Curated annotation (Swiss-Prot):
Homooligomerizes; requires L27 domain. Interacts (via L27 domain) with ajm-1; the interaction regulates ajm-1 apical junction location. Residues 697-715 have a biased composition (Polar residues). GO terms for biological process: cell-cell adhesion; chemical synaptic transmission; embryo development ending in birth or egg hatching; establishment or maintenance of epithelial cell apical/basal polarity; nervous system development; protein localization to synapse; receptor clustering; receptor localization to synapse. PDZ domains are required for localization at the adherens junctions. SH3 domain is necessary for let-413 dependent lateral distribution. L27 domain is responsible for homooligomerization and interaction with ajm-1. Residues 682-696 have a biased composition (Basic residues). This is Disks large homolog 1. It comes from Caenorhabditis elegans. Residues 5-65 form the L27 domain.
Length: 967
């Protein structure tokens, strides 16, 4: 290739980007989209190649533990991937292939020598035939990425400690439709005195209307023939919470229910613990690890307790008679969900469109509330007469479907991760959706909306009851199973009424009912802390439903003359239970109040579930984030024995903080494991010694907040590269001192620099893509690198301005052009995380703009000051990933800037004065906002090292739950 051709090739991607920007006319959308895919794919492939080479250098070539032969083998693997071409990094499962079996025990070796390589194995998603039959010709001699099927890369590690406990960690790198995903599954257990391995598992179930859904036997008064007194699970009931959760197995041993020990106890103790456990139940299970272990037989004495009913302690014992069954009664486990291969199940999206119009594919990422929608329909459970399709009947607030915005009530779900739902049963559709991973691909057919009422009156339909532990009374006994909620922890089955919505008066109204065999047919909640008694659910086909006069959201005021306006839940339940026919009710419809109550209870429930799933921390425990680096070897005085070092951002579990000088703590790893106990300096010691050090060296600089005079955003130092203009030109106010949001910052008047030592933190589940804020050295360069390298994951947000649009500018793309007065009001109402004025025009970043980027599944790159971090946390309840780049000197800033600017011909080099000014500014930022950083990056050797650590932190902090400041 000639030198001239080489130069043209280097500029090719820039030329394509420039051409893409010119496609603004209507009709160019498809061409523009395809060109953007070309650009994104190229950059993604380039990034993968660079990361491969970086890992090869860091982990293999620099390793002193690997032989030359091992290094050569790793080099060959990289060659295979690189020579595989662009498709090596972009394999996707073909839409026309059949469903793959991901449960095979056989695996395909990674390379052609068929030997195990240190716990790694390669599995072709197509099954054994593809793995070994075709694999010898294709998979084994080519890159594992170069295939049209879904692949797994497994790594399994086992650790056994001296005390008999073991831990097995399985790491899978999965090639999904959305790219490579790393999934980690951990199993823990113990080895008993007989050398038998037991696997331990903690699960959380929500009773809802379906109950726990399993039966138990055993106990000290009902031992097995060999004397085993354990509490065993004898059956898992179809439609119950245990089956929906999927983790409990038949023959599991229950060792604890919430905080009640169930080992070496009578059968009645376990039954009572489960009955009184409340709506959210935490279970500790153990099972034999041995695969050859046979299921327990039926030779148990006593009774088997059937735990399907969702009753609470307020229900009388007489109502529980139906829940006890003899062990002689045959119990058949539910059959596995069928796999359907209808005539449409193997079609591509394009082929679907020929038979089903308005089809499209959407990807959802589960959050704290799961997929966030309800379904109805299926064979034998038609939602629309003559139609067995699966319909979306409700979109759950703040769920993944609502955040995505494309799924609507009335849409049909045709496929889930290539599993066809055509002509399937309702139960199978639920199981398929329940067993999906964090990222779910749906093939949907958009509905016309003709058979669904999507107006505000839809609230009159029966809604999902929000259940509070020990505060729900069930007045029916029938099975309700025509609609399934797919929100996180939501009840499994709820009926969907076909009754048309009607107007309901808001004043108190009399209602007369006659009890039937199934009671009155509605549920009540409330009655605690002076709350009204609400009707939370109306059973379809029940007495209340058929009357047409009882609605979800009604407040129960009287029952047969008994006033319930200030009654407790127990008093209301007794009044309803003792009421004779006919039953005279006084109801008042209060939809707004009920929605507030429902939201409050749902938040409480989600908090309980989230805390239980993440391993609820003991109240006596204290978790902190370190806000400084600590090296025991640099202690001026003699450090105690077992001193433990740590870095900024490390999470520490404080075990003992009674001493004024030294604390006992354990370091918490990313996977939740904790190190051995060590000794760390106390908060008091750290702060006292730091203040003494500052006094000795007369350390007076940086005591003021960055405020408005120190140009905290740092944008004025941009040097005009084309990519940087996407940030800097949109915020010219950074050159002005008129920073609106900073006028009232209390931190600007702080007389003494704070000393950052430890910050109390707690875990919080998140269901959104977190924005990213880079602070410190070269943050402008790094922001540009993130957006340019991976625009599918990172994006800037559209700012607001009060100035009129210029030629070529488009509202919603370049800026949101708004009225100045309205923008000033929004700033006062805390709707902006940062705003300022330039040449009498306002510029700013709104909270909604940040959310818009997150709803697209991308990290919003924010070029803002540290004050914006506080505003995001306090005003928007958004926890950004804030990374501080800490330089060691001004010279290091010059070197890193030079490395980042190597391939940018339109950038001039940073001067020494600019580097020194930026170094001083970094020092002030650290002193002012040191408690707001998620992580700090220091002691780096190259620009690539910085970028690698930034990517690593963002990836790690994108997983839920996260550690957030505890207030």
């Amino acid at each position: 290739m000639s030198h001239e051709s080489s130069e043209k090739a280097h500029k090719a991607i820039e030329n394509v980007e420039d051409y893409c920007q010119t496609l603004t006319r209507h009709g160019n959308e498809e061409l523009r989209t395809n060109l953007e895919r070309v650009i994104t794919t190229f950059k993604s492939n380039l990034m993968h190649s660079l990361l491969d080479i970086h890992d090869l250098y860091e982990q293999t070539l620099l390793s002193e533990r690997k032989s030359d032969a091992e290094k050569n083998m790793e080099v060959r693997r990289v060659i295979e991937r690189l020579e595989g071409g662009p498709h090596s990094y972009n394999s996707r499962p073909a839409a026309t292939t059949s469903t793959s079996n991901y449960n095979l025990s056989s695996t395909t070796p990674l390379i052609s020598d068929l030997r195990d390589r240190g716990g790694f194995s390669y599995l072709n998603g197509g099954g054994l035939g593809n793995g070994l039959g075709n694999g010898l010709g294709n998979g084994l001699l080519s890159s594992p990425y170069n295939s049209s099927s879904t692949h797994y890369l497994h790594e399994r590690q086992r650790q056994t400690s001296h005390d008999g406990t073991w831990r097995e960690t399985t790491t899978r790198t999965v090639d999904t439709p959305s790219g490579l995903e790393r999934r980690v599954v951990e199993h823990t257990g113990v080895i008993d005195d007989h050398g038998r391995k037991w696997e331990l598992e903690n699960i959380v179930l929500e009773k809802g209307h379906t109950g726990l859904g399993f039966s138990i036997t055993g106990g000290m008064d009902q031992p097995t023939e060999d004397g085993d007194t354990s509490i065993y699970v004898t059956n898992i009931i179809e439609g119950g919470a245990a089956l929906a959760d999927g983790r409990m197995r038949k023959n599991d041993i229950i060792t604890a229910v919430n905080n009640t020990n169930c080992e070496n106890v009578k059968h009645e103790v376990a039954v009572n613990a489960l009955k009184s456990s409340g709506n959210v139940v935490s279970l500790s299970l153990k099972r034999r690890k041995d695969e050859a272990f046979l299921p327990i037989g039926g030779n148990f004495g006593g009774s088997t307790s059937y735990l399907r009913s969702g009753v609470t302690p307020s229900v009388s014992a007489g109502n529980l008679q139906h829940a006890i069954h003899s062990p002689s009664a045959p119990i058949h486990p539910p059959p596995p969900p069928p796999v359907h291969h209808g005539s449409l199940s193997q079609l591509s999206v394009g082929q679907y469109r020929s038979t089903r119009p308005n089809t499209s594919v959407i990807d959802l990422v589960k959050g704290a509330r799961g997929l966030g929608f309800s379904i109805a329909g299926g064979q034998g459970n038609e939602h629309v007469k003559g139609d067995t399709d699966i319909y979306v009947t409700k979109i759950i607030e703040e769920g993944a479907a609502e955040l995505d915005g494309r799924l609507r009530v009335g849409d049909k779900i045709l496929e889930v991760d290539h599993h066809s739902l055509i002509n399937t049963t309702h139960e199978n559709a639920v199981n398929v959706l329940k067993n999906t991973g964090n990222r779910v691909r749906l093939l949907i057919q958009q509905g016309t909306g003709a058979i669904f009422n999507d107006s505000a009156s839809q609230q009159f339909m029966p809604t999902t009851p929000i259940l509070r532990p020990s505060s729900v009374q069930d007045y029916n006994r029938s099975q309700m199973g025509s609609q399934s909620h797919l929100s996180y922890g939501g009840p499994l089955n709820t009926s969907y009424s076909s009754q048309a919505p009607i107007a309901i008066p808001l004043e108190p109204r009399p209602v007369q009912l006659v009890k039937g065999q199934n009671g009155l047919g509605f549920n009540i909640v409330g009655g605690e802390d002076n709350e009204p008694i609400y009707i939370s659910f109306v059973l379809p086909g029940g007495v209340a439903d058929l009357s047409g006069n009882v609605k979800t959201g009604d407040v129960l005021l009287e029952v047969n003359g008994v006033v319930l306006r200030n009654a407790t839940h127990k008093e209301a339940a007794e009044a309803l239970r003792n009421a004779g026919n006919p039953v005279y009710l006084t109801l008042q419809y209060r939809p707004q109040e009920y929605q507030i109550f429902e939201s409050k209870i749902e938040k409480l429930r989600n908090d309980v579930i989230a805390q239980s799933r993440m391993g609820t921390l003991s109240r006596k425990s204290e978790y902190v984030r370190a806000l400084f680096d600590y090296d025991p070897s640099r202690e001026n005085s003699v450090a105690p024995h077992r001193s433990m070092g740590f870095n900024y951002g490390d999470i520490l579990h404080i075990i003992n903080s009674s001493d004024d000088e030294w604390w006992t703590a354990r370091k918490v790893h990313e996977n939740g494991e904790e190190t051995a106990e060590g000794v760390i300096p106390s908060k008091k010691r750290v702060e006292k010694r730091e203040r003494l050090r500052r006094k000795q060296v007369n350390f007076n600089s940086g005591s003021q907040s960055l405020g408005r005079n120190s140009s905290t955003t740092g944008l004025e130092n941009r040097r005009g590269s084309r990519s940087q203009l996407s940030f800097s030109r949109k915020f010219p106010f950074v050159k002005s001192t008129d920073r609106l949001n900073d006028l009232n910052e209390e931190s600007s008047n702080v007389a003494e620099e704070p000393v950052w030592s430890y910050q109390a933190v707690e875990q919080q589940a998140i269901n959104y893509v977190r924005p990213v804020i880079i602070l410190g050295a070269l943050k402008d360069r790094i922001n540009d690198e993130l957006v340019n390298r991976d625009p599918s994951k990172f994006s800037s947000c559209v700012p607001h301005t009060s100035r009129p649009p210029r030629e070529g500018e488009v509202n919603g793309r370049d800026y949101y052009f708004v009225n100045k007065h309205n923008m000033e009001e929004d700033v006062k109402n805390n709707l902006f995380i940062e705003a300022g004025q330039f040449q009498n025009n306002l510029y700013g970043t709104s909270i909604q703009s940040v959310r818009d980027v997150a709803n697209q599944g991308r990290h919003c790159i924010l070029d803002v000051s540290g004050n914006a971090i506080r505003r995001l946390q306090s005003n928007a309840n958004i926890q950004p990933i804030s990374i501080f780049i800490k330089p060691s000197s001004a010279q290091q800033i010059l070197e890193l800037d030079s490395q980042l600017a190597t391939n940018r011909q339109d950038d001039r080099a940073m001067s020494g004065e600019e580097a020194q000014a930026q170094y001083s500014r970094c020092h002030r930022i650290e002193q002012t906002f040191g408690d707001l950083f998620t992580q700090e990056i220091s002691n780096v050797h190259s620009a690539n090292d910085v970028l690698s650590k930034v990517y690593s932190i963002i990836s790690r902090e994108s997983q839920t739950p996260i550690w957030v400041p505890r207030h």
